[in-house]
Amino acid sequence: MATSTPSRAREHASAAQSPGSPTRISRMQEKEDLRHLNDRLAAYIERVRSLEADKSLLKIQLEEREEVSSREVTNLRQLYETELADARKLLDQTANERARLQVELGKVREEYRQLQARNSKKENDLSLAQNQLRDLESKLNTKEAELATALSGKRGLEEQLQEQRAQIAGLESSLRDTTKQLHDEMLWRVDLENKMQTIREQLDFQKNIHTQEVKEIKKRHDTRIVEIDSGRRVEFESKLAEALQELRRDHEQQILEYKEHLEKNFSAKLENAQLAAAKNSDYASATREEIMATKLRVDTLSSQLNHYQKQNSALEAKVRDLQDMLDRAHDMHRRQMTEKDREVTEIRQTLQGQLEEYEQLLDVKLALDMEINAYRKMLEGEEQRLKLSPSPSQRSTVSRASTSQTSRLLRGKKRKLDETGRSVTKRSYKVVQQASSTGPVSVEDIDPEGNYVRLLNNTEEDFSLHGWVVKRMHMSLPEIAFKLPCRFILKSSQRVTIWAAGAGAVHSPPTDLVWKSQKTWGTGDNIKITLLDSTGEECAERTLYRVIGEEGETDEDFVEEEELERQFRSQSHQSVDPSCSIM
């Protein structure tokens, strides 16, 4: 490929002679680069040939497809024109149906105002009944407290009565023992008196015996004296008189000692008996006085007990009367609540029926708008490809672009000219949210841009959301779930906003939480947010729908629809149970 001069040949020879010279190395490098470039050129040529073959094949297929599409377009154009005429007829029918529904909505609104007035009257009656019930309950609690106090006093008096009865029984037992002891002492005294009388009789008897003995001795002595000598009679008589005198003195001394001893014993025993009798008499007197005092106290306690029993009976009768009044009030309240629930159920059914009709109308309208837009785009594409002039009705068609605003109702009717000079109108759509809840916390709002989801505590108490989960579901998006932090407490009537990471919000608990692992909550139609408690049971949900407006609507129409929707929401919020609000 390259020619070399004689000098270069010499250089080659010298390079061959010196294998490690720089010239030889550069030549070898150039040779290698040239070989690589040749390989790349061959591959490129092969690739170009392959692409040219594919191009010729694709040209053949394109020609065949153009022939087929031209035939199909001719058939489809006729079919689309027929279906478009049918769609226009259906749109006219839908407009007529909408006018009829607006008239019915006015009637329903009037009926709702009447039901609301009647409901407010029932609520006032219910509040009055509840106030009366609270007053009766407070009076009942007061009477129950007084009854409990009286019963406690009665129990105390009964305990005191039992104690007094026990004391009376003890005193009566002591009195019986004392009486028995006094009786025994009296018997002992009588026995001692009998013994003393017996001793006295024995003493008299011995005196008589002694006197008789003395007389007999004297008689015998006199007899002996007669026999004795008269000379010694005087001496003997004197000695006998002395002996008798001494014997009499000894006998009298013995009698006196025995009498003194007997009197001392009797006096001591009698004194002991008298002391015991006096002591027993004092004890019996004290016992009698104590028994009298106890009887008096028992009578007093019995009278107090009868008085408290009468008061207790009166209070029980009063409690029964209050209980009857309370039962009647409860029955009346139950009947009023049943009537109110029935009316609320009827109102809710009426509103639910109207809402379902409205949703069906919106679904039909949305389907028609989507189908008309699809037909219009296909016809415009075919007209541009076939270079056909658009019809006058097609010049005035509108294409409404869906844009999201925070007002949930988007509208735009400013006309502008596109590049072809045709009049174009931005299409607006409404964002409708439907919610329900069965627990204390509800899903208050869903951002159409997917930036946040807001929860609301509907109660007057703090509520713990430990273990609760907020889940998003969509037909074309994967299911995602956000678990609320541990020990998270939502204050009464407070809101918490859960921001996506892409919204750029600041994490500020407990009012603002940031989901750092999720860029957005998602956008589109039919986005559903559900709130699950710690057991996995669904407590609240909210669904976001996008409803496209009609072509002929003006700003005033959208304003009127927005006003009707706001009134409908406020009326639904007032009439429906707070646990199941419909928006």
From Swiss-Prot:
The keyword Coiled coil applies. GO terms for molecular function: structural constituent of cytoskeleton. Residues 216-242 are annotated as: Linker 2. GO terms for cellular component: intermediate filament; nuclear envelope; nuclear lamina; nuclear matrix; nucleoplasm. Residues 80-215 are annotated as: Coil 1B. Phosphorylation plays a key role in lamin organization, subcellular localization and nuclear envelope disintegration. Phosphorylation by CDK1 at Ser-21 at the onset of mitosis drives lamin disassembly and nuclear envelope breakdown. Gene3D superfamilies: 1.20.5.170, Lamin Tail domain (2.60.40.1260), Vasodilator-stimulated phosphoprotein (1.20.5.1160). It comes from the Eukaryota. It comes from Xenopus laevis (African clawed frog). The keyword Iron does not apply. A lipid is attached at C580 (S-farnesyl cysteine). The lineage of its organism: Eukaryota, Metazoa, Chordata, Craniata, Vertebrata. The gene is lmnb3.L. This is Lamin-B3. InterPro entries: IF_conserved, IF_rod_dom, Lamin_tail_dom, Lamin_tail_dom_sf. The modification Cysteine methyl ester is found at C580. Residues 429-546 form the LTD domain. Residues 68-79 are annotated as: Linker 1. Residues 1-30, 383-431 are annotated as: Disordered. The modification Phosphoserine is found at S21, S391.
